[in-house]
């Protein structure tokens, strides 16, 4: 599910060079304008069916060349799920509060994925070209994930295809799209990241930010003990979401079987979610005042940040890992992203905004090491002619997307997929690979 500020809808963000005034201390209500719609649920885009190239005419005596399909032709990786795999926030490399151009790596067409490159196939799926699906090296990528998707398709204001076989006037579910795509491609690996929106994580973050902005340091109102938040993490709800994820994974297996694949011809990779913020002690802005949100875009009390890492994230990822076991397939692997951004998270000590670390832009030497890999939680900065979307909040930005791609390439393992946990290589001195990605390490599963 995706929520947004009550500002005029835009078919795509406009690239405008603008200088924002320093955040002045105003009545609290000013800071709350639009912040009730912080969205984490983010982005998948359906793709138009690709025409299979017809080989040149052969002598009449030659056997016809086989068309690409199960086990035949160029290998493909397909990604399914929600915003954490679709490419949401993949436009922005770090952040600046003074000039958006300093962090604008992909520009206003960042999420254009239709055949002509002129717009989105599904509005607000936000499938960026920096998304992890495109590992290269002779492997083709197809991104069917959608920002805001849950395990089941939603046909509300914005169509959000789930991992099911839905087909209607609004579009198709991701499992149906996978089945159709796999019939004419040699799909060797399907990567799934889903479940966060089933846990209502967007509304959880919304509650945490609102509680931070509306309570004083001497009487902190925490979100982790709000009944609306706690309800998402009861044993009953965790079991329910785990069951839904199992159903989604079963749908993936059914789609591949219907397309003509045996389990030995492809691998299912279940991908967990990364921690987007450090514990409270690792946040570089004080709890006092509004700087933590107005400057850093990370308006959480320390205890809520600690809870997010000690309880919320492990619970969500545990449900995914449990579902991977429950589905009972012999071709399942796991990519654990829990600590993939540690040291580069939003508001974390050791990294900062471009103006804080003294770098001109994302193209500056060392930018990948000194700036954040997770996008700010945005509120009033999305109003008017802003190039930002609320739904980009708290998602892997350009560096984060490329880091996950580097991890996934290691999982692909030259066509022999393996499981693993991903972390930053050379933490504190992160560097780019020759392909322009952060160098990551795939270690054993924790």
Describe the function of each predicted region.
Residues 70-71, 87-93, 153-157, 201-206, ...:
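Short, solvent-exposed loop/turn and secondary-structure capping segments
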Residues 75-92, 100-104, 197-199, 398:
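Catalytic nucleophile-elbow at a beta strand-turn-alpha helix junction centered on a G-D-S/GDSL motif
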Residues 63-79, 171-190, 246-267:
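Short amphipathic alpha-helices and their capping/turn segments at secondary-structure boundaries
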Residues 99-240:
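Conserved SGNH/GDSL esterase-like catalytic core that processes O-acyl groups on lipids
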Residues 2-64:
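Secretory targeting and sorting signals
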Residues 275-395:
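Mobile gating loops/cap/lid regions near enzyme active sites that modulate substrate access
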Residues 130-141, 241-268, 304-336:
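A structural motif corresponding to the C-terminal end of an alpha-helix
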Residues 83-87, 146-152, 196-201, 274-278, ...:
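Solvent-exposed loop/turn segments at secondary-structure junctions
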């Amino acid at each position: 599910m995706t929520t947004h500020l009550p500002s005029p809808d835009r078919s795509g963000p406009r690239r405008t060079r603008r200088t924002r005034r320093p955040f002045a201390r105003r009545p609290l209500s000013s800071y709350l304008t639009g912040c009730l719609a912080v969205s984490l649920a983010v982005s998948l885009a359906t793709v138009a069916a690709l025409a299979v190239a017809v080989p040149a005419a052969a002598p009449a005596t030659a056997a016809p060349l086989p068309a690409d399909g199960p086990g035949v032709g160029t290998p493909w990786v397909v990604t399914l799920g929600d915003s954490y795999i679709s490419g949401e926030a993949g436009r922005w490399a770090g952040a600046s509060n003074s000039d958006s151009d300093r962090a604008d790596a992909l520009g206003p067409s960042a999420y254009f994925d239709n055949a002509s490159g002129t717009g989105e196939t599904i509005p607000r799926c936000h499938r960026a070209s920096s998304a992890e699906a495109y590992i290269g090296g002779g492997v083709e990528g197809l991104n069917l994930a959608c920002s805001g998707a849950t395990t089941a398709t939603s046909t509300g204001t914005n169509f959000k295809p789930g991992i099911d076989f839905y087909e209607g006037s609004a579009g198709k579910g991701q499992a149906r799209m996978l089945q159709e795509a796999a019939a004419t491609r040699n799909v060797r690996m399907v990567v799934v990241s889903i479940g966060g929106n089933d846990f209502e994580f967007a509304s959880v973050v919304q509650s945490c930010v609102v509680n931070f902005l509306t309570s004083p340091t001497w009487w902190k109102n925490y979100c982790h003990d709000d009944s609306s938040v706690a309800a998402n993490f009861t044993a009953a709800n965790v079991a329910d979401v785990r069951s839904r994820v199992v159903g989604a994974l079963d749908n993936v297996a059914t789609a591949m079987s219907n397309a003509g694949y045996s389990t030995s011809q492809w691998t299912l990779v279940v991908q967990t979610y990364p921690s987007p913020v450090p514990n409270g002690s690792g946040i570089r802005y004080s709890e006092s005042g509004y700087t933590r949100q107005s400057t850093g875009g990370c308006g959480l009390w320390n205890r809520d940040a600690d809870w997010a890492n000690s309880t919320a994230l492990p619970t969500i990822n545990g449900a995914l890992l449990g579902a991977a076991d429950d589905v009972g397939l012999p071709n399942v692997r796991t990519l654990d992203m829990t600590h993939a951004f540690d040291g580069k998270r939003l508001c974390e000590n050791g990294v900062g905004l471009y103006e804080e670390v003294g770098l001109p832009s994302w193209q500056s030497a060392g930018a990948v090491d000194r700036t954040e890999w997770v996008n700010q939680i945005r509120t009033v900065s999305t109003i008017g002619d802003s190039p930002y979307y609320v739904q980009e909040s708290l998602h892997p930005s350009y560096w984060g997307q490329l880091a996950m791609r580097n991890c996934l390439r290691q999982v692909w393992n030259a066509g022999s997929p393996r499981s693993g946990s991903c972390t930053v290589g050379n933490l504190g001195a992160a560097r780019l690979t020759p392909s322009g990605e952060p160098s990551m390490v795939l270690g054993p599963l924790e």
